[in-house]
Amino acid sequence: NLSTHAVMAQILDEIEYVGDAIREIHVELQNDRLAMAEGARDKLIQARLIQDAKLREAAMLDVIHSATDAKRVLMRNFSQNMYHITEHSQKSDFQMMLDFKGEKDISRKAIDAFQALVYITNSVQTECEGYAMLGEYEPCKECLEEFKSFILENRLNERDTLLLLNENSSQKRIEVVDQFTDIAARITAFDPKAHIEYSVHNLLTAETEHTGGDSDEQ
């Protein structure tokens, strides 16, 4: 029946249109998450230039709060993506062959997860540098302890976890695997009794080059 085929074709077109719209929303959401972290970093650079001590202190507190908000949003998103990637990795080769769209979705989640790791690290660094500017090192230690908990909860201290992300991503990022392996080792070995004011920069390093939020599906 031609009319039935026409209706079915229209429905399939509409489903594909909705799928494209959802992917566009996803890209916008990921860009918003990354922009939060970038905004906190920009605020830190600007706050350092404020001459008035009281205004600088108020601005620095705003920097810290912005960095914490960005960090938490990215951490939650990373954990959700990591859950789906782990579930996907347990499928058989045959199941994966039958689920092409799922494979593409997992690749997007892996790309997002790598981006999130870099920006989470940068957000923690922003938090710590903000507290250091205020001469408050105890909350800085707390930030590092929270980061350590995140790393351990997501098994990011295990290189295999990072390699799983890389394996499922269409954009191979072995350099991020190497960098974060090093960061995770230092953070998990961090001694909270250490002189934190001398070690923040050594503990936290991550590059943002080539980790832009734009999707490869645009």
What are these regions (language model features)?
Residues 1-28, 183-203, 207:
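Membrane-inserting effector segments that mediate pore formation, membrane fusion
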Residues 4-65:
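Amphipathic, membrane-active segments
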Residues 40-43, 47-218:
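Long, helix-rich, hydrophobic modules that act as membrane-proximal anchors or helical bundle/coiled-coil regulators
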